[in-house]
UniProtKB/Swiss-Prot annotation:
tRNA processing keyword on record: no
Top-rank lineage group of the source organism: Eukaryota
Enzyme Commission designation: 2.5.1.18
Residues at which glutathione binds: R48, Q55, L56, Q69, S70
Organism: Dictyostelium discoideum (Social amoeba)
Enzyme class label: transferase
Domain annotation GST C-terminal: ranges: 87-207
Domain GST N-terminal: 8-85
Name of protein: Putative glutathione S-transferase alpha-4
Recorded family membership: Belongs to the GST superfamily. Alpha family.
One term of GO molecular function: glutathione transferase activity
Swiss-Prot/TrEMBL catalytic activity: RX + glutathione = an S-substituted glutathione + a halide anion + H(+)
Annotated GO biological process: glutathione metabolic process
């Protein structure tokens, strides 16, 4: 059963896996946001009434404002904490990176785990192409948005990098190949709140191995979060 949201904290509701919601979780941990995390095993009728797109995650602000899409949630939180770039060019580069991570890296990786297909492409094309591009930018600039401060672009890069390792996509290919991204990973994981999140986060390998029957019926379960 879903817990009742409090009035004093935002609430994030998700299935018990990392998926796309982990970007918002790491973002809020990094900024020390105090919120209620509510994991559910299914979407019941009561919860479904609150979902604009019949999917999770669902984010509720203290004033009742709701968002039902992971990219919108991270944009909302990033905007509140001045984490989306200082200029229009930086913000455009943030959008470019976030879209790339979401669509070109994480989505095909999850799909590959679910279908058992496309693993070689993740290892031989996706990892070198996209993380190689991010590594090049970080070699030439301090941050991915080419400004003087971290943004959600850097966070998305780190989380995706860590996630592909978790899903078992050739950790040998990742180890030592992208030193600038490794530095980015170390920076985020040195944050005490992020460290606490890492201790408690779900294991997606177990989740996908025991995928609920109702999600198996979804023609594209990767889009549920």
């Amino acid at each position: 059963m879903m817990t009742t949201p409090t009035n004093s904290k935002p609430q994030l509701t998700s299935l018990r896996y990392r998926g796309y919601v982990q970007f918002a979780q790491v973002l809020m941990a990094f900024h020390g946001v105090d919120y209620d995390m509510c994991y559910v095993d299914k979407i019941d009728d009561q919860l479904r009434k609150e979902l604009k797109f019949d999917q999770l995650p669902l984010f509720r602000e203290t004033d009742g404002f709701k968002l039902n899409q992971s990219l919108a949630i991270t944009k909302w939180v990033g905007d509140k904490y001045d984490f989306i770039g200082k200029s229009s060019k930086e913000r455009a580069l943030v959008v470019e990176t976030v879209a790339c991570v979401h669509t070109d890296i994480v989505m095909p990786a999850i799909r590959s785990v679910l279908t058992g297909q496309g693993r070689d492409r993740i290892i031989n094309v996706v990892i070198p192409r996209y993380f190689g591009a991010f590594e090049k930018v970080l070699t030439e600039n301090k941050y991915l948005a080419c400004g003087d401060s971290l943004t959600i672009a850097d966070l998305y890069c780190y989380v995706a990098y860590d996630y592909l390792g978790h899903l078992g996509f050739a950790p040998d290919h990742l180890q030592g190949k992208f030193p600038k991204i490794d530095c980015l990973k170390n920076h985020f994981e040195s944050n005490k709140n992020v460290q606490e999140y890492l201790k408690k986060r779900p294991d997606d390998n177990e989740f996908f191995k025991n995928l609920p029957d109702w999600l198996k019926k979804d023609s594209c379960p990767t889009m549920s979060c």
